[in-house]
């Protein structure tokens, strides 16, 4: 299954699983109002916010079990996460990479947190990611994962705890 999500509103629960081998870089401009689950189970990347910022108003879980990456808030400034973020990277995953474009930014709302569930494969990169408020952040990358990279321009407002095979900044 291939996805092309552009300037759409999702008012209920969304569960999107990518299985096609092609890479999907979604334009963006989407508003996700309900609980959202994004899964990449393919050999291509699954990206968001390539030309327009996305707004995630509910909790979101990103799970990568395919051999490429999930790319949230990839290329433009102004991506908003107004719910909690949970990250999973398993199977043959290359990892999850936030804000890869030179001007991309993501902001996590006050009282919300970004945490890991099962993260035993691939890397986690958080660039130009800002957490408002003081909610605790726990990122646990188990043995078998590659590394955690923070920055440039990444800010956490709360207590930050991480365990990872390698930590870069």
Which residues fall in each region the model found?
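Extracellular beta-strand-rich, repetitive "passenger/adhesive" scaffolds
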Residues: 1-31, 35-55, 61-80, 86-169
């Amino acid at each position: 299954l291939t996805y092309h999500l552009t300037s759409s509103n999702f008012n209920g629960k969304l569960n999107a699983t990518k299985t096609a081998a092609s890479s999907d870089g979604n334009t963006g401009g989407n508003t996700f109002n309900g609980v959202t689950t994004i899964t990449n189970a393919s050999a291509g990347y699954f990206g968001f916010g390539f030309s327009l910022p996305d707004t995630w108003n509910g909790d979101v879980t990103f799970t990568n079990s395919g051999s490429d990456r999930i790319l949230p808030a990839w290329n433009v400034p102004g991506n908003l996460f107004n719910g909690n973020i949970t990250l999973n990277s398993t199977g043959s995953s290359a990892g999850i990479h936030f804000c890869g474009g030179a001007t991309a930014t993501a902001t996590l709302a006050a009282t919300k947190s970004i945490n890991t569930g099962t993260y035993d494969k691939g890397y986690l990169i958080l660039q130009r990611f800002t957490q408002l408020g003081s909610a605790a952040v726990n990122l646990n990358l188990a043995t078998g994962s590659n590394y955690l990279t923070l920055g440039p321009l990444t800010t956490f407002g709360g207590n930050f705890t991480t365990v990872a095979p390698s930590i870069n900044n």
